[in-house]
Amino acid sequence: MAEMATATRLLGWRVASWRLRPPLAGFVSQRAHSLLPVDDAINGLSEEQRQLRQTMAKFLQEHLAPKAQEIDRSNEFKNLREFWKQLGNLGVLGITAPVQYGGSGLGYLEHVLVMEEISRASGAVGLSYGAHSNLCINQLVRNGNEAQKEKYLPKLISGEYIGALAMSEPNAGSDVVSMKLKAEKKGNHYILNGNKFWITNGPDADVLIVYAKTDLAAVPASRGITAFIVEKGMPGFSTSKKLDKLGMRGSNTCELIFEDCKIPAANILGHENKGVYVLMSGLDLERLVLAGGPLGLMQAVLDHTIPYLHVREAFGQKIGHFQLMQGKMADMYTRLMACRQYVYNVAKACDEGHCTAKDCAGVILYSAECATQVALDGIQCFGGNGYINDFPMGRFLRDAKLYEIGAGTSEVRRLVIGRAFNADFH
C-alpha cells in the first residue's frame, strides 16, 4: 500500500508539473468536446483512480480529441513524438513500470483507465499507446534482465523512444507458433531472416520485441521460439510502407523485414527457446489492457450520441424523447457499464495476483463485440448524419472492429474460454 501511495503521489507530481508548463508547439488549445460524466462511484474506483481519469480526460480532450478526425482522414498523426513525450511527462507510458526506471509503479486497473481515456479521445492513438506501454514496456519489465531494463526502459517511459511488439506474420496470425522468421546463432549473435506483418507502431518504433524461431525442429513447435529486443537501425532490419487500414488510421502499421539482421545474443528477452512463455503470459495481459480500448470507444459514442438526441428534432420534438431512441440510449449505456464492471474487476484481480487466461480473453471478447454494436447503434441514432464522414460515428465503428480481430480474434478468445472449462473436467 505504501508503494502504491508513493507511486500515486509521483504521478500527481508529474501532472501538477505539466500544468505549470506551456503546451508544446503545435498543440494549440481547442475547446474540448462536451463529455458525459462517468460515475466512478458505481465503477468502484478509489479517489486516486478517479483523479487519474479526470486528469487524463482533461488533457486528452484538449490536446488529442480535436485532432482525431484529421488523424483518421490523413492516416497520420503529425505530432506523434511530441505527444508521446507529453504522455511520458504525465507518467502514463510506464504506468506499470517500477519507479526506479522512471515508471509510476501503478497497477493494471490504472493502465486500463488510461487506455480507456486515450481511446475515448482517439481510438487509433489508444491502440498505439497499448502497443507501446503494454506490449513493449510491460514485457520488458516482466521478462528483461537488469541490463536490458536499464538500457531501454527509461527512454521508452519518457517517450523519447516508441516501442512495439512483433508476433504475427503473413501466414501466422492466430496460429502464431507456426511463425517462419528464423534466427540462426552465429557466435555471440543471431542472424534473423524473414518478416512480420500487421505490426502496430512498426513504422515509428525505436525498440521492438520480436519473436523468431531458433529451433526449427522443435516438437511441439512452440518450444523453438525465442524473443529478441530489436532496435531501429540494426543492419538488415527495415520496414515497408505503412498499411492503409479500414480503421485505427493514424496508428501506423506495417511489415517488418529481416535480411541477415544481426542481433546480439545479449538482446534475448528471457531465455533461448523459451519465448513462448514470454508470449503467452504477455498475451493475457495484452488482452486485459487492450480491453480498455473498446470501453473508451463506447464512451465516445455516448459522448456524441446522447447530446445529439437532445438537439436533433423531428415531428416537433427532440428525438431523444421517442421511446425507440430511449431504448437505444439504454442499450448503449448498459452494454458499456456491464463491460466496465467486468474489465475493471479482472484488472483488480490481476493486481492482486489472480490472473486467468479465461477472463483476460473474456473481457476483450465481450467489450470488443459490445463496442461494435454500440457504434452501430450510435450511427443509427444519427440517421443520415451517422453515414457522413463529417461526423465521427463511422470512425468509431471502424476503430471498434479492430478489437474483434487484434490481440487474438473473437473466435480464438472463445476457444481459450471453452478450453479452460474443458481443462477443469479433464
From Swiss-Prot:
Look up the EC number in the record and give it. Answer: 1.3.8.4, 1.3.8.1
Q: What is its main location?
A: mitochondrion
Chain residues that bind substrate: S174, S222, R223, Y277, D284, L285, E286, R287, A407, G408
> Gene name, please?
IVD
The record's listing under Gene3D superfamilies reads: Acyl-CoA dehydrogenase/oxidase, N-terminal domain, Butyryl-CoA Dehydrogenase, subunit A, domain 2, Butyryl-CoA Dehydrogenase, subunit A, domain 3
Any one biological process term the GO annotation gives:
L-leucine catabolic process
Q: Identify the catalytic residues.
A: E286
Disease field? Isovaleric acidemia: A metabolic disorder characterized by retarded psychomotor development, a peculiar odor resembling sweaty feet, an aversion to dietary protein, and pernicious vomiting, leading to acidosis and coma. The acute neonatal form leads to massive metabolic acidosis from the first days of life and rapid death.
For this UniProt entry, the molecular function terms from Gene Ontology, in alphabetical order, are: 3-methylbutanoyl-CoA dehydrogenase activity; flavin adenine dinucleotide binding; identical protein binding
Q: Its catalytic activity?
A: 3-methylbutanoyl-CoA + oxidized [electron-transfer flavoprotein] + H(+) = 3-methylbut-2-enoyl-CoA + reduced [electron-transfer flavoprotein]; pentanoyl-CoA + oxidized [electron-transfer flavoprotein] + H(+) = (2E)-pentenoyl-CoA + reduced [electron-transfer flavoprotein]; hexanoyl-CoA + oxidized [electron-transfer flavoprotein] + H(+) = (2E)-hexenoyl-CoA + reduced [electron-transfer flavoprotein]; butanoyl-CoA + oxidized [electron-transfer flavoprotein] + H(+) = (2E)-butenoyl-CoA + reduced [electron-transfer flavoprotein]
Give the record's keywords alphabetically.
Acetylation, Disease variant, FAD, Fatty acid metabolism, Flavoprotein, Lipid metabolism, Mitochondrion, Oxidoreductase, Transit peptide
Q: How does it assemble?
A: Homotetramer.
**Residues that bind FAD, according to the entry?**
165-174, 198-200, 312, 323, 380-384, 409-411
Q: Which residues carry this modification: N6-succinyllysine?
A: K58, K67, K78, K262, K318
* N6-acetyllysine PTM sites in chain numbering: K58, K67, K78, K241, K262
Q: Where in the cell is it found?
A: Mitochondrion matrix
Indicate the residues annotated as transit peptide: 1-32
Effect in UniProt of substituting Y403N: In IVA; uncertain significance
Pathway noted in the entry: Amino-acid degradation; L-leucine degradation; (S)-3-hydroxy-3-methylglutaryl-CoA from 3-isovaleryl-CoA: step 1/3
The entry's cellular-component GO terms read: mitochondrial matrix; mitochondrion; nucleoplasm
InterPro entries cross-referenced by the UniProt entry:
Acyl-CoA_DH_CS (IPR006089), Acyl-CoA_Oxase/DH_mid-dom (IPR006091), Acyl-CoA_Oxase/DH_mid-dom_sf (IPR046373), AcylCo_DH-like_C (IPR036250), AcylCo_DH/oxidase_C (IPR009075), AcylCoA_DH/ox_N (IPR013786), AcylCoA_DH/ox_N_sf (IPR037069), AcylCoA_DH/oxidase_NM_dom_sf (IPR009100)
Where does the sequence pass through the membrane? none
Name of the protein this chain belongs to: Isovaleryl-CoA dehydrogenase, mitochondrial
**Pfam families this protein is in?**
Acyl-CoA_dh_1 (PF00441), Acyl-CoA_dh_M (PF02770), Acyl-CoA_dh_N (PF02771)
- Enzyme class, top EC level, equals oxidoreductase
Which cofactors does the annotated protein need, by name? FAD
- Which lineage do the record's taxonomy fields give for this organism? Eukaryota, Metazoa, Chordata, Craniata, Vertebrata
